[in-house]
Amino acid sequence: MIQVPFTDGITFEVVPCFLNKDNSSYTYPNANDGGSWKTTNPRPEMDAIRTRNAACNCNLVPLCRMMRSWKNKWTVPIGGLLVDTLSYQFIENYEHREKSYLYYDFMCRDFFKWMADQDEEQEFWKAPGSGQYVYGKGLFQYKTKRCYNISLEAITHETANPKQEWSAKQKWREIFGTTFPD
């Protein structure tokens, strides 16, 4: 894997992969535990995310991106596919899934609460579209509960009279880092 860092704090991880004879799945190297080869088929997952994103007023992809920022800021022991999988599952029945970006504060708060309530004994989740098993890398519930509480504080600042925008922004930055929200 090659890491490509950018000055804004975003880092891309580039992994070589090889298209298999079925023209839909890929084989890629896994450097963990002495090395091995793994196979993935991302197209059904991409299609499922695209379909659900369209069904929820294009709120799924921003949620995935925000939660990846949170994962990186808090060094949460979960992979990107698990972030996407959990976001996908959460937004399916979320009451504000079709609202505008003005509800992102509530969406983040409610997602943190939903994640905090995930069973700590659960070892894997099924990825959208492909159904492949996505394994957790460690417990994430404690950090999720902490960020849920911080999001409550941020929303309290946002809804105060008069509104305390600077304080709210500082709380959101405590969760997502200084590049969010801008």
Task: Describe each PLM feature range.
Residues 1-25:
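Conserved catalytic core of two-metal-ion nucleotidyltransferases
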Residues 20-21, 31, 84, 95:
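General N-terminal targeting signals
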Residues 27-64:
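A structural motif
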Residues 59-165, 170-173, 178-181:
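Conserved nucleotidyltransferase catalytic core and NTase-mimicking acidic/glycine-rich helix/loop elements
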